[in-house]
Amino acid sequence: MELYESTYFIVLIPSVVITVIFLFFWLFMKETLYDEVLAKQKREQKLISTKTDKKKAEKKKNKKKEIQNGTLRESDSEHVPRDFKLSDASPAEDEQFVPAPLNVAETSSSVRERQKKEKKQKPSLEEQVIKESDASKIPGKKVEPVLVTKQPAPPPPLEAAALKKKAGQKKSKNGSEEQDKKVEMLMAPSKEQDVLLSHQDTKQEGGLGKKKGLSKKQKSENVAVLVDEPLIHATTYMPLDNANSNLMMDKREIIDMIKPDHVEGIQKSGTKKLKIETDKENAEVKFKDFLLSLKTMMFSEDEALCVVDLLKEKSGVIKEALKKSNKGELSGLLHQLQEKERLLSAMKEDAAASKERCKRLTQEMMTEKERSSVVIARMKDRIGTLEKEHNIFQNKMHASYQETQQMQMKFQQVQEQMEAEIAHLKQENGILRDAVSNTTNQLESKQSAELNKLRQDCGRLVSELNEKTGKLQQEGVQKKNAEQAATQLKVQLQEAERRWEEVQSYIRKRTAEHEAAQQDLQSKFVAKENEVQSLHSKLTDTLVSKQQLEQRLMQLMESEQKRASKEESLQIQVQDILEQNEALKAQIQQFHSQIAAQTSASVLAEELHKVIAEKDKQLKQTEDSLANEQDHLASKEEELKDVQNMNFLLKAEVQKWQALANEQAATAHEVEKMQKSIHVKEDEIRLLEEQLQHEVASKMEELKILSEQNKALQSEVRKLQTAVSQQPNKDVVEQMEKCIQEKDEKLRTVEELLETGLIQVATREEELSAIRTENSTLTREVQELKAKQSDQVSFVSLIEDLKRVIHEKDGQIKSVEELLEVELLKVANKEKTVQALKQEIEVLKEEIGNAQLEKAHQLSVTSQVQELQNLLRGKEEQVNSMKAALEDRDRGLTGRGTCAQVCSTPQFEELESVLKEKDNEIKRIEVKLKDTESDVSKMSELLKEVQEENKFLKCQLSHQKHQQASFPSQEELQTVISEKEKEITDLCNELESLKNAVEHQRKKNNDLREKNWEAMEALASTEKMLQDRVNKTSKERRQHVEAIELESKDLLKRLFPTVSVPSNLNYSEWLRGFEKKAKACVAGTSDAEAVKVLEHRLKEASEMHTLLQLECEKYKSVLAETEGILQKLQRSVEQEESKWKIKADESQRMIKQMQSSFTASERELERLRQENKDMENLRREREHLEMELEKAEMERSTYVMEVRELKDLLTELQKKLDDSYSEAVRQNEELNLLKTQLNETHSKLQNEQTERKKVADDLHKAQQSLNSIHSKISLKAAGDTVVIENSDISPEMESPEKETMSVSLNQTVTQLQQLLQEVNQQLTKET
């Protein structure tokens, strides 16, 4: 408990306020006493101790002054009690509230003992005071009132006894001892009074609230003390510090007491007339001198005792004055005490009220705390639940975020792996390029070295040719041999070229095959993309079809709701008819009561009671039927709730089945069959709905017929009322009977129609049973399909959608069945209403018979009225009433016409509303068609976007090759393609079926429009018929009124043939003129007696007239009441309609909310499906990339093999060059041998000069060949590796070999460079 919540704090506030109020009053009353105390304290502070040396002189002066002023002391002593009176009575009220006692250390027990002892010691105290005054010579008492404290402290009992003993002794001996004891006794109360004066302000606040009872007791005790002990008031205690100070204080107090008493003595000395003014002035001067001397004197013990004795001598006068003054003051004090007690009682009451308020506030605070604690607990629970939900949601978000991060990390890892692999491939390509460049550089260096060597050889050969021109013949033979070797080398080179061409053709074939494979893969990829697009389009088409089916279901639900509202309106109309019948029954009961009052027939009353009992039973039956309908509605609401729960369960199952997203083509044909059966069922349901609409329209017409019959009955009842008031003829009764017969026939026709309707309902129930059987078979088939789907998980989503559709169709069928049941109940209620109407018609027949009897009785009564004046007046009144009735009828006819128009207008408005609803439905369907077209366009756009996305994915596939681990075979791809093609065909068929459904719906809308126009024409024809009927009835009524007027005129003319009135006048004016002339005729012929008789009869007629008027007024009041009841009923019906509309709106809102939730769940499903598809696409892309990576690796391996083959070719070529080099060495050796032979034959050449010419010719040819070789070597940068150091062979033999070798080397180098360039280009393309 905190401080502000504790009850102590609440209790302390009012107590503090009360203490503050008391302190305020106490301080206000205590101001005089407080001023006196301040003055006394100042006086005490001004006392100055005189010197001891001047005591004797002062004593002498005091003795002289006492002798001189002896008389004055007596007069002054008389005034001392008055001073006491003024000092005690003025602050008495304030002194009573001083809280602190004299002895602060005393306990409550000692205080009680002292209060008891005060009463006993009052006489002893008086004696003690007298004895002390006689015995003591030192004035040791201060004149102060005892009422300064609440409990005056009397002397203890031991001290009182000692004082009594000392009083018996001599004064002279024991004076000093008594003075010492008095000083000791006075010390304690004086000290206590100092404590009180110092702590008075602080203790007043706390003491007032605690000791109110003690203050009240002490007030009464102090008053008693004032009455009984006047001398004690003059002897209060003061503190005494030492002997000198006591003396000075006594003198000071005596002077203070004498000053006011002297003034009073001067006022009272007016009685002493003998004294002279001069003596008074001298006495005043002496008294002033005496006062001054007292102020400066220091008394001894003897002198003080003398002063006390003189004062005691004057004490008798003081007692008398005190008694006189106290008597006047007691009444004032008592009055003040009473007022203060009243104030205290009022303050106590206020305190009690404040305590009660505090208690109430505490209770309210406790209740509010409890409420707040409950609210806080609820809020804490709510906050806890919200925090839990928030934590769960955060955990879900965190998990999803972690999953996304994991996916991103995986994707980054894949990218990094791809980049690493790409870098590795680039490195390998660089290595290969470096190797190729190194090989080319090496070949070029070798060729350049060989060319240099060849040049050197050519120079040497030229020199040798110049020297050895004579040896050409032998060289010719050698040339032939060399030519043969060259031909062999050429053949070998041709074979090498053929092998190179074969290698190139093999490489080209491999590249062509690789390109064809790539093209095949690209075509397959394009086909797959097309398949994906087709699947996407199929899914979108299926979604669109689902949405269309949902929209159709919503339309069906809305139409059912509209039908329910129409049926409710029909029920309301039936209730209105029943209420109108009840009102008519009430009117009939009132008529019966009036007739019973006139005829006093008990039999009629009993019959009426029976009828009322029967009608009460019927009402109870209707109420029971209404209760059953309400129970049925409650059961329907429970069924709706069950359906909603089923929907939620189905949604949960849908979420479970979403994981199984793989599709297969095994159940496609079965799905198509199911869809066809569903379409057939939808057509059947539409036919049933149309039949129900026709039935509702027929029942509406039947209700209209019943309402018209009810109106006709009401009009007939009104006719009966007017007939009773106007005494109609028997023809009217016959007409009523005919009308009743016609109504019986109509009721029979209605019963027949109801029977036919029941037959139709039975047939429809059979149809519904057949549909149920079909649905049961379909559900079984669906269950079988589920069993199949456990093995084959494909097309699960489609089957689930079909299940949903089947469930929805079952729900629709159930709703149709419920509607049929409701219609059966309505038919039963209508049959009950028909029976009630039959009973009412029978009752009306009985009432008509009773009315006929009553009319006969009234005719017998009216036949007694024979005299002319009564007849005239009666006829005039009848004519007036007829006029009023005619006017009322005209008004009623107009009102009925308006009512009929109003009745027709709401029906017309209902039909118009129906037409508008149909038009709105047509517009909705058109809007849906437009939406479908827009959806198709959107789908085409989506396809384009998907194609673009596929292109983008292709680009991504090139980056994600290494993630592909497995690739499906071509057979699986073909199966998938065939399945997708089948799905595409199915979707096309569905599109065609949807288009046919749209066209069928358009045809239906056109038919509905035509029907609406026909209904409008039928309404117009019915309105015309109603207007014609109204006109006919008004004409008939006017003719009837005119016939009655003519009959009345003829009657009057027959009665008074002498009276003549012009016939051109109106009926009312004609009656007035006829009345005046008839009165004139009767006045001339009648006698006094006849006049009296006539007057008597006139009075009777007037009484009858008044009675009839009263009855008319009653009927009018009844009609007004019925109209008011009808208006109230209409209002109640309108209110109920508004309530039902509100409920319908709420149900529609609930349905919309459910639809929105369903659409949201569908969107989530679509989103999940798309995510699954994306995952599948990514998986496929991964597989495709892995396949491509494998292909790239295969290509890489092929390239490596090709490079190896090229290296092998290079090695073979090098081997061939080495062989040619060895052959060249061998030929050099042969040339050396030939040189030796040439040296041998050199001698022979000198002889053969004839042959030198030939050699010269050969040399010329050799020079030409050498020039050609030099030109070829300068053009080409290739040469032979053969080094011929010392060759004696002629240049004509070596030149063709060099040429052939250089040509072959150049060709091989160019071919190798081309191959390397092609390899580099392919690698760059792949990267």
UniProtKB/Swiss-Prot annotation:
It is a single-pass type II membrane protein. Residues 30-1327 are lumenal. Belongs to the kinectin family. This is Kinectin. Residues 1-8 are cytoplasmic. GO terms for cellular component: endoplasmic reticulum; endoplasmic reticulum membrane. It comes from the Eukaryota. The chain crosses the membrane at residues 9-29. Pfam families: Rib_recp_KP_reg. One of its GO terms (molecular function) is kinesin binding. Residues 49-181, 197-216 are annotated as: Disordered. It is found in: Endoplasmic reticulum membrane. The keyword Protease does not apply. Expressed in all tissues examined including 12-day embryo, adult heart, brain, ovary, kidney, lung, small intestine, spleen, thymus and pancreas. Residues 329-1327 form a coiled coil. Receptor for kinesin thus involved in kinesin-driven vesicle motility. Accumulates in integrin-based adhesion complexes (IAC) upon integrin aggregation by fibronectin.
